[in-house]
């Protein structure tokens, strides 16, 4: 503690510069000055979305990113772009001929436009779940039990068409039902 150490001072206008330079980030990590920055690593299967003061400002590519948080609120949302299974569990439904049946369906969905997905709905998966529920109800209620048993593939196609027509605004797609 008694040795003389050289200190370099570099002024950075954080009001004008949002992104933290890599050479500064390494030094800040080493000194644990993390309160002034928000950093994250966006994986290869993810899309990162940068929100500054609640406004979407940029889509982040895979890699390490850091931003000055002095004088502003920084939030980074990471959205998984891989197909995700979505299971609509045991719904009790009545067929056209008033027979009670229990329907379970698994769909695979994928986010194709992360900006739309982040801005369109608070929870895209919950919205997709409800859309699939409505589609199943519509397809089953219009048929008798015998028609349902004979036309399972047709019902899958109807459910997929119903959901596909409504999820474009959510930035998602159904890859398989």
What feature does the model see in each segment?
Residues 1-177:
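N-terminal hydrophobic membrane-entry segments
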């Amino acid at each position: 503690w008694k040795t003389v150490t050289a200190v370099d001072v570099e002024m950075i206008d954080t009001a004008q510069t949002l992104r933290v330079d890599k050479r500064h980030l390494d030094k800040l990590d080493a000194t644990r000055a993390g309160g002034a920055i928000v950093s994250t690593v966006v994986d290869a299967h993810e899309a990162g979305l940068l929100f500054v003061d609640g406004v979407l400002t940029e889509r982040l590519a895979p890699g390490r990113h850091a931003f000055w948080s002095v004088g502003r609120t920084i939030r980074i949302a990471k959205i998984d772009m891989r197909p995700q299974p979505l299971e609509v569990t045991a719904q009790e439904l009545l067929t056209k001929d008033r027979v009670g049946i229990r329907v379970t369906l698994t769909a695979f969905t994928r986010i194709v436009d992360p900006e739309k997905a982040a801005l369109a709905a608070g929870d895209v998966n919950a919205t997709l779940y409800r859309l699939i529920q409505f589609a199943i109800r519509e397809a089953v209620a219009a048929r008798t039990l015998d028609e349902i048993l004979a036309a399972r593939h047709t019902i899958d196609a109807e459910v997929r068409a119903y959901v596909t027509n409504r999820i474009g605004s959510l930035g998602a797609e159904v890859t398989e039902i």
